[in-house]
Amino acid sequence: MAFLEEDFNDFIRLDADRIAFIQNYLNGIGLDCPIIQVDGKNHLYPVFPKNQYNALFKIKTIIAHYDRVPNTPGANDNSSSVYSLLRFAERLINRPGIHNIRMIFTDGEELSEGGVASQGAFGLAKLFKKLGITKDDVYVFDCMGRGTIPVLTESLLPKNLPSLFVKDFCQLEERAEKIIRSANGGKWTKLPCNYSDNAGFIANGIPAVAFTMLPSDEADYFLRSGQRPLTWEKLHTMEDNLQSLNEEAFEITSRILDNLADLRTVQHA
């Protein structure tokens, strides 16, 4: 498709070496991308220049899982988000000033059917907690390649959470709402969705939100009827292919990411 470079086809090939693809892309724009191994999962961590960070402001950790259900293209789930983040990384290294973006491509999200503790991000969040990295804003991007309406996923928080966590989570949700609202002319929605990598962070006491995209008619019908959107029915099948994607979804995702780079939230002790 004209709005995607030819190498996207290479990324969604059934035999693609997705780790090598991501690392080669980032190396090609001048970024190292070491593997962080946690609980047998291989997470990828692009390293941006230190002068693009300022400790006065919150770090914004942006996450997209690169794994996919075996023997499926995974074009929307989640190659679309990964590719948008790779393009974003290229914009970040060329923009002046700070951005405070921490970017991680996670492994093992598709294992979450075995429970949140089996999810790759759970071990990563546990490592964050061990290292004292608990004050980041965490934004998860999942299935961002199809649709015209950005969706903030509704999160059902466990009961009896500390009041400080609930306060921090609500403030993060407010920031997330402003970001997607401004990225699409005020058109956005909030829907109950399957947990993504945000679940692993929440389970470890770190607030995290997740974004996805849906066609407007599917989002509206889901709100009215509770009927599972066609977009979600395509996931984990051969129909999650290049032809299911649309250009506007990538344009909206790009604006969301740029808004995140512009966001400044003062870091409190």
Residue ranges and their predicted role:
Residues 28-36, 177-190:
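Short secondary-structure junctions
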Residues 2-53:
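A non-catalytic alpha/beta surface segment that caps or lines the substrate-entry region
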Residues 218-269:
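His/Asp/Glu-rich mid-to-C-terminal helical/loop segments that flank catalytic regions of hydrolases
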Residues 192-227:
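Short glycine-rich, acidic/polar surface loops and turns
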